[in-house]
């Protein structure tokens, strides 16, 4: 075993000891609560590092709030609604039966996840790939792997609240039906037709999350010119200027297929892609045959370049702008041809879209049930919520744009898993629309059933309906839906209402930035529609995508890490620390494996040092504390304040900066400066572990409970920035002496200067006066330079201007909060030790070569 692996195993053993000390705690309702949620992941595979990055934002914050004494609820569900699971199960069945062409092998995907193919038919081995031809096998398999990964990761999750979605879970099914009944009662749901991206394989709308390729692609209208023999060819926007001509040239490729088809009694010819869109937008379209243009049209130019669609050569004038605008504006909800003179319009995807089923998508005019997110009253209500919401400036701006942009959303589907729409049992509710207020379900789930899918009931399913949820959410006080003699059921309903009232609203919703334009804006709008204002979400945090070693994660290119692999390679604590420093904004973050390895070594060294110091404990009187002792205490406590502020702001990079690196540097400096109080070092490590507990909970828990103890220190009049400034000054002085003196010099004269040069002191005094008089004046800089010019000599002008501006903007740099002479004399031996030179300390009132905190340094 390599040295690195030995150290990793050592850390993992300590983590496991700390993990065993973590027990599920009871909720004490006399404490303040904090409710954190994260979008439940889709159960068509195991978790990867990208999932874990976003989860870590919520998880670390949950531990932080727990440290503050809150009752933290961080639940976790498993999303199974939608078509990807059904599509994969269907494709797998075809693949095992050798039916049809397979673009991506589901067998190979499942093999990459660790499953094996024992047979091509049905067998009893639950780990056999053949079992995945049943969509619900996916729903029952991947949640357990997901949970196991997150348990090993030390996630602070209340697993009693977990569940899977879809109508296989009757409790969640009733919850979604309640939601959509409520929305229908509010007149937020309507029915109609809409041009939508459509998958012919699934025979239904294909939204972004259902696509393998083409996320964000929308339907766009194109105008087709009707040429001789009713040949339809797209008109480009640059050809919008005038009249049709019988000699128009068609530019195309030999490889493009052309289809002859009829609409009612009219026969047309169009390339196959155009035909495949028209047939889903117009009634009575029938394919006649595949044809070639040769013989049908005389003016054809064949090119070898890769063109997306055939086009008309721009040597002739084709279409007036007025006609074009009329055609585009004539969008209607009838399955009829949009035609004007020698032109027709159809809708196509603006770019290639491939569904998860492998189908090349078209545009169809579909019957749809809509959530009417364009409703102005609904939007205005959401604006109130958004104005009160806490979020980063970037996230809030993106949410505001999304709210302005959002329009009707078609939610009905014909294929996949999910809940049937209560007003039309022929359709399912899509996977984005059934996932907007499910956080409320977490608050009561543990009272309703034990398992993930409602097969182990605690509350009778017969009572689950609209009246139940109205009562729980406080919209009704009627409880007559319960049998009066069923006292246990009545108690559960009361407890459910109490739990909801205790935990709602959501205090923090964490999500990837890619969900701002859909899930997160739906999340806000549905909350304001369903719940009272006091139960609207309070804070949203979003993060960017995660890169791996600076590159986009990709299985096919070998740049990929699953959660299990990451934890196996780096252990839990190093993985968590590396995720914490990856990034804290909507910009892409970067997980660097070499950094994760370095954290393994750093945590190993830290652990060894803690064991050494813990076995050499001693006590000392506060009266015996030295300057370096005061430095240690002040620095650790100030780092603690900065660390906890960074937690609150969800800037975890700074948590690692202050809580880990700065604390380590403080302890190393303490030892370098001769600090020898083991009791204080023990206290410093204890506080460091407390500060890092949310990031490395199991390792910190082990040290806090088993190795370190909380030592009581009287902090009154001890914590002061002056102690830190004094020691940092000495460290900088050592650096300057080593840098600016001759290597072979044996002796250094260190001349401390008591005062700034007279011209600087006059400038400083004048600037302080001007800041009081002109504190709100935008021209303060100009006034300062004008007033201070009298103190700055001509030979000093450039230097003087720079000094005045620096003092005006950064006065704190010039505030001397410690005794320079005291610190220099106290730590003279340390300076000599670190520079290997004899130090002679001299004092001057002022100097042209030095000033306070910047002594003259002369080797001799």
UniProtKB/Swiss-Prot annotation:
Superkingdom in the source lineage: Eukaryota
Pfam families reported for this sequence: tRNA-synt_1 (PF00133), tRNA-synt_1g (PF09334)
EC number of this enzyme: 6.1.1.4
Entries under SUPFAM superfamilies matching the protein: Nucleotidylyl transferase
Residue window of motif 'KMSKS' region: 552-556
Binding site for ATP: 555
InterPro entries in the record: aa-tRNA-synth_I_CS, aa-tRNA-synth_Ia, Leu-tRNA-synth_Ia_arc/euk, Methionyl/Leucyl_tRNA_Synth, Rossmann-like_a/b/a_fold
A biological process from GO: leucyl-tRNA aminoacylation
Organism: Enterocytozoon bieneusi (strain H348)
GO molecular function: ATP binding; leucine-tRNA ligase activity
Protein name: Probable leucine--tRNA ligase, cytoplasmic
Main location: cytoplasm
Protein location: Cytoplasm
Keyword Cytoplasm part of the UniProt annotation: yes
GO CC field: cytoplasm
Span of the annotated motif 'HIGH' region: 41-51
Catalytic reaction list: tRNA(Leu) + L-leucine + ATP = L-leucyl-tRNA(Leu) + AMP + diphosphate
Keywords assigned: Aminoacyl-tRNA synthetase, ATP-binding, Cytoplasm, Ligase, Nucleotide-binding, Protein biosynthesis
Family membership noted in the UniProt record: Belongs to the class-I aminoacyl-tRNA synthetase family.
């Amino acid at each position: 075993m390599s040295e690195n692996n030995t150290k990793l195993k050592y850390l993992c053993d300590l983590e496991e000891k700390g993990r065993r000390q973590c027990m599920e705690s009871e909720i004490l309702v006399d404490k303040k609560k904090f409710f954190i949620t994260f979008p439940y992941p889709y159960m068509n595979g195991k978790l990867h590092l990208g999932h874990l990055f976003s989860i870590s934002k919520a998880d670390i914050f949950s531990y932080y709030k727990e440290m503050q004494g809150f009752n933290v609820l961080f639940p976790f569900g498993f999303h199974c609604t939608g078509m990807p699971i059904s599509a994969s199960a269907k494709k797998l069945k075809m693949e095992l039966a050798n039916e049809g062409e397979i673009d991506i092998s589901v067998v190979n995907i499942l093999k990459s996840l660790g499953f094996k193919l024992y047979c091509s038919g049905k067998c009893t081995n639950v780990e056999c790939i053949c079992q995945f031809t049943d969509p619900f096998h996916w729903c029952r398999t991947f949640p357990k792997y997901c949970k196991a990964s997150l348990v090993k990761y030390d996630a602070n999750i209340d697993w009693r609240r977990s569940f899977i979605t879809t109508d296989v879970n009757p409790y969640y099914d009733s919850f979604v039906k309640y939601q959509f009944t409520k929305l229908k009662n509010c007149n937020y749901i309507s029915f109609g037709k809409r041009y939508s991206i459509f998958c012919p394989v699934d025979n239904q709308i294909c939204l972004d999350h259902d696509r393998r390729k083409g996320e964000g692609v929308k339907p766009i209208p194109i105008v087709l010119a009707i040429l001789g023999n009713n040949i339809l060819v797209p008109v480009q926007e640059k050809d919008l200027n005038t009249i049709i001509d019988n000699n128009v040239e068609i530019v195309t490729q030999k490889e493009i297929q052309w289809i002859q088809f009829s609409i009612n009694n009219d026969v047309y010819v169009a390339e196959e892609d155009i035909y495949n869109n028209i047939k889903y937008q117009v009634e009575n379209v029938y394919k006649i045959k595949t044809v070639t243009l040769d013989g049908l049209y005389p003016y054809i130019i064949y090119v070898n370049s890769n063109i997306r669609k055939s086009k008309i050569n721009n040597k002739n004038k084709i279409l007036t702008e007025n006609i074009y605008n009329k055609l585009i504006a004539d969008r209607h909800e009838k399955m009829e041809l949009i035609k004007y003179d020698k032109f027709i319009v159809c809708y196509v995807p603006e770019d290639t879209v491939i569904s998860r089923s492998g189908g090349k998508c078209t545009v169809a005019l579909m019957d749809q049930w809509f959530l009417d997110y364009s409703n102005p009253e609904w939007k205005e209500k959401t604006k109130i919520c958004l104005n009160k919401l806490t979020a980063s400036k970037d996230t809030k701006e993106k949410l505001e744009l999304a709210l302005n942009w959002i329009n009707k959303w078609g939610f009905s589907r014909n294929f996949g898993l999910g809940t049937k729409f209560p007003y039309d049992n022929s359709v399912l509710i899509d996977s984005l629309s059934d996932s907007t207020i499910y956080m409320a379900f977490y608050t009561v789930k543990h009272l309703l059933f034990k398992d993930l899918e409602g097969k182990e009931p605690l509350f009778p399913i017969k009572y689950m309906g609209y009246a139940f949820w109205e009562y729980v959410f406080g919209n009704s006080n009627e409880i007559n839906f319960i049998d009066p003699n069923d006292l246990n059921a009545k108690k559960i309903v009361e407890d459910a209402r109490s739990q909801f009232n205790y935990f709602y609203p959501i205090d923090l919703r964490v999500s990837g930035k890619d969900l701002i334009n859909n899930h997160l804006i739906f999340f806000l709008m549905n909350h304001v529609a369903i719940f009272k204002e006091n139960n609207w979400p309070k804070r949203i945090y979003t993060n960017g995508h995660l890169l791996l070693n600076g590159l986009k994660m990709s299985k096919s290119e070998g740049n990929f890490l699953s959660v299990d692999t990451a934890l196996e390679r780096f252990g839990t604590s190093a993985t968590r620390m590396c995720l914490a420093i990856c990034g804290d904004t909507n910009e892409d973050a970067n997980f660097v494996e070499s950094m994760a390895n370095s954290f393994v070594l750093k945590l190993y060294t830290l652990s060894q040092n803690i064991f050494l110091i813990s076995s050499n404990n001693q006590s000392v009187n506060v009266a015996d504390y030295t300057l370096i002792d005061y430095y240690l205490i002040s620095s650790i406590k100030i780092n603690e304040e900065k660390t906890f502020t960074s937690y609150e702001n969800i800037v975890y990079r700074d948590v690692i900066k202050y809580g880990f690196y700065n604390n380590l540097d403080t302890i190393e400096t303490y030892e370098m400066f001769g600090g020898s109080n083991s009791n204080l070092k023990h206290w410093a490590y204890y506080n460091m572990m407390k500060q890092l507990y949310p990031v490395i909970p199991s390792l910190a828990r082990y040290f806090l409970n088993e190795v370190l103890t909380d030592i009581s220190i009287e902090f009154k009049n001890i914590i002061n920035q002056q102690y830190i400034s004094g020691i940092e000054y000495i460290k900088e002085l050592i650096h300057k002496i080593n840098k600016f003196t001759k290597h072979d010099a044996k002796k250094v004269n260190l001349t401390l200067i008591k005062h700034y040069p007279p011209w600087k002191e006059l400038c400083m005094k004048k600037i302080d006066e001007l800041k009081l008089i002109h504190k709100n004046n935008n021209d303060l800089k100009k006034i300062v330079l004008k007033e201070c010019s009298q103190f700055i000599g001509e030979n000093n002008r450039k230097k003087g201007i720079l000094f005045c501006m620096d003092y005006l903007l950064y006065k704190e740099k010039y505030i001397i909060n410690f005794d320079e002479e005291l610190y220099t004399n106290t730590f003279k031996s340390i300076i000599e030790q670190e520079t290997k030179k004899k130090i002679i300390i001299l004092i001057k009132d002022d100097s042209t070569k030095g000033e306070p905190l910047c002594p003259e340094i002369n080797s001799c």
